[in-house]
Amino acid sequence: SELARSRGKRVGVAVALSLAAVTSVPALAADKVVQAGETVNDGTLTNHDNQIVFGTANGMTISTGLELGPDSEENTGGQWIQNGGIAGNTTVTTNGRQVVLEGGTASDTVIRDGGGQSLNGLAVNTTLNNRGEQWVHEGGVATGTIINRDGYQSVKSGGLATGTIINTGAEGGPDSDNSYTGQKVQGTAESTTINKNGRQIILFSGLARDTLIYAGGDQSVHGRALNTTLNGGYQYVHRDGLALNTVINEGGWQVVKAGGAAGNTTINQNGELRVHAGGEATAVTQNTGGALVTSTAATVIGTNRLGNFTVENGKADGVVLESGGRLDVLESHSAQNTLVDDGG
């Protein structure tokens, strides 16, 4: 894994530096060390060169470190930001790798054309273009990352991404399988904005909070999603997924699939809540003009302009259908006190 490689390389670098210090033997020609208090501006890393940064490195271009692929343990080379080290305005391009270790900081990095950043420290204002990737490992924090077309951010368990802007991942259509573009979350993602064509996938162990989704963007929930606002965007809650405090505004959909659950959803005018058979939505607030699409094989409990309503155990009571709303009453099931209004 990227994390294993980072840790392994960190040990190797430390041993090499310690040996050089003790024996007064200079580092290998391919290893460029930026000492604490030193600043290096511009330069290029190629052909398995290493830059080991304890001080400050600005404007570097990195084109080595991933020649054997992102999953190969045989990779060497790249830029290594150590504890206290700082890298600014770096470009990581084809086959390039930037490793930000615990206590290290990278800012204003552009990663493109298959380059990657392995993060156990802090990364600020990273831009991912055209197969550029960022791997946020345990203890790593990425803030202000922008994920453009075919870019990919993976937030591992124990990692944190905050203020991410996602512009890719859903080009194949809503809830399609674009596994390695957009954002995939096993750790925590906070204050994310998902724009047209953007996708956030929250895996079983993942948590997303305070997410804003615009038209053409979507969120796939297999873990937990808290405080999501759908401004025309879509949220899909899969089996074992949980979404709490979702607000559905005009053009937005929340889709709760079999085995998924939603709590405290608010449906505003021209927003839509869809609950599939075997799905569950409780504490729903259906405001005037909001649509509910479900069947008596689902569980939906909440309030609407008539008062309390329920759909559970094959019985529906007090449901309001409008603005595209629909209730399918299955064989041997029942519905009472249903109001079918404009567009229902």
State the predicted function of each range.
Residues 1-18, 22:
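Bacterial Sec-dependent N-terminal signal peptides
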Residues 10, 287-288:
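Extracellular interaction modules
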Residues 22-24, 133:
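Intrinsic disorder/low-complexity segments in short proteins, especially the signal peptide
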Residues 25-29:
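Sec/Tat signal peptide C-region and signal peptidase I cleavage site
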Residues 30, 36-43, 48-50, 55-60, ...:
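The right-handed parallel beta-helix/beta-solenoid scaffold, focusing on the short coil/turn
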Residues 70-72:
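Surface-exposed intrinsically disordered loops and tails
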